[in-house]
Amino acid sequence: MSGPRPVVLSGPSGAGKSTLLKRLLQEHSGIFGFSVSHTTRNPRPGEENGKDYYFVTREVMQRDIAAGDFIEHAEFSGNLYGTSKVAVQAVQAMNRICVLDVDLQGVRNIKATDLRPIYISVQPPSLHVLEQRLRQRNTETEESLVKRLAAAQADMESSKEPGLFDVVIINDSLDQAYAELKEALSEEIKKAQRTGA
C-alpha cells in the first residue's frame, strides 16, 4: 500500500483512544483520515454505519476474512472486529495519514504485514480509573465490564513490552495526553502538510 505512513492507535476500551482520535481528526481534518473498522456487534446509541463502524453480519465478515480482505481482525466478547484493506486504501488514496484504532491482537497482526505504521498505545493511569470511566459510560453489562477489565489488564501489561509500541501515552489528563499524541505525530504531520495531504 502506498501513501502517507499510517498510525496504529491501541489501548483498552475506556482509555480515551476514541476521544483523542476525534480531537486529532477535528484539528487536522485535511491531514488524517480514520480507517473505519468492521464489526459484527450491534451499534451503540449514536453510532452510525460507515462512520463509526461498518456493522456487518458474522457470515459476511467471515467470508471477507477468508478471502484475505482484512489487514487485521480479532474476536472480543463474541463479536468480530477488523480493518479491511479497502478501508485503509480509501484513506491513503486521499493522501491522508490513515489512523487505525485496533486492539492488542490487531497490533500483533499488523506487525506481520508490510504496512509500517507508527504504533501508539493509549493507557489509563490505573485499572481503578479505567473501571470508573467504563462505569460512567453506562454502556456495559456487569459481565462485559469484567471481560473488558480483564482484557485491559493484559493490554496494560503488554504496552510495556519492548518494541511493541513506538509511543505509550498514559491518559491521566486529556489535554496532556493529546499534547503527547500530537508531539508523537509532529514529524508525520509536517510531512503531510508539505506534500499537501
UniProtKB/Swiss-Prot annotation:
**What's the family?**
Belongs to the guanylate kinase family.
Cite the Guanylate kinase-like domain residue spans from the record: 4-186
Q: Output this protein's name.
A: Guanylate kinase
SUPFAM superfamilies assigned to the protein according to its UniProt record, in alphabetical order: P-loop containing nucleoside triphosphate hydrolases
Role:
Catalyzes the phosphorylation of GMP to GDP. Essential enzyme for recycling GMP and indirectly, cyclic GMP (cGMP). Involved in the cGMP metabolism in photoreceptors. It may also have a role in the survival and growth progression of some tumors. In addition to its physiological role, GUK1 is essential for converting prodrugs used for the treatment of cancers and viral infections into their pharmacologically active metabolites, most notably acyclovir, ganciclovir, and 6-thioguanine and its closely related analog 6-mercaptopurine.
Record key words, sorted: Acetylation, ATP-binding, Cytoplasm, Disease variant, Kinase, Mitochondrion, Nucleotide-binding, Transferase
| Annotated active site | 44, 137, 148
> Consequence of mutating residue 25 to P?
Leads to aggregation. Increases in kcat with GMP as substrate
Q: Which disease is it linked to?
A: Mitochondrial DNA depletion syndrome 21: An autosomal recessive mitochondrial disorder characterized by ptosis, ophthalmoparesis, myopathic proximal limb weakness, variable hepatopathy, and altered T-lymphocyte profiles. Multiple mtDNA deletions and depletion are detected in muscle, as well as mitochondrial respiratory chain deficiencies.
CDD domains in the cross-refs: GMPK
Tell me the organism. Homo sapiens (Human)
Indicate the impact reported for residue 96 to H. Increases in kcat with GMP as substrate
Question: Which PANTHER family does the UniProt record give?
Answer: GUANYLATE KINASE, GUANYLATE KINASE-RELATED
- Tell me what controls its activity: Up-regulated by RD3.
